[in-house]
A protein has these predicted regions:
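Short, Lys/Arg-rich flexible segments
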Residues: 1-182
Length: 182
């Protein structure tokens, strides 16, 4: 049970680090390339999730998520004993990350109450107003919101943390890795 739990956690952390969303936000304010391909309709090198979400240039938003995921996976030592067809099975409980807890820990930098993790999965409006700019008014030093629409661009929601957590839970239950879309 401990080996499967550790293997599942290792796979979850590997999937988190390999995610284009994680990598793009982790790249910080210096990166202006949208390699997660969530920002549809903006040119290559004209912005990234880090700038569009509006993180401060000194923020490291992934660190808190990374710490939470690393702290998860506690195995409860007392198993449930199941007897079936002359066999005895032991079922262990493992604490998995809670997406709602992650959402509570990740508020949008400019909009209290809404989570940027949830926004990545559900959608973020205003991409057509996003202007790549090195303006001192920009928190990220990457871009600002223009007063008028600049282009027909849309944010493409993507299953992110929920897919990673669901794959982790499935691995714990079945012992089989899930393929995540990149």
């Amino acid at each position: 049970a401990e080996k499967r739990a550790q293997d599942a956690k290792d796979e979850m952390l590997k999937a988190f680090e390999a995610s284009p969303v994680t990598r793009e936000i982790d790249a910080g304010a210096e990166n202006t390339v949208n390699f997660s391909k969530n920002l549809m309709g903006i040119g290559y090198g004209e912005g990234s999730l880090f700038g569009f979400i509006g993180f401060d240039q000194s923020d490291n938003p992934m660190e808190l998520v990374r710490e939470y995921l690393n702290a998860s996976g506690k195995i409860f030592k007392t198993p449930k004993t199941i007897k079936s067809a002359g066999q005895i099975y032991y079922q262990y409980k493992v604490e998995i990350p809670n997406v709602k807890n992650l959402e509570a820990m990740t508020p949008m930098p400019w909009e209290g109450g809404r989570s940027w993790i949830r926004a990545i999965e559900r959608g973020i409006s205003g991409l057509g107003y996003y202007l790549l700019s090195n303006s001192p008014r920009s928190r990220s030093t990457q871009g600002v919101q223009a007063s008028r629409k600049l282009r027909n661009a849309t944010y493409r929601p993507t299953k992110y943390i929920s897919n990673i957590v669901n794959a982790y839970a499935k691995y714990l239950q079945t012992g089989k890795k899930s393929k995540l879309k990149k």
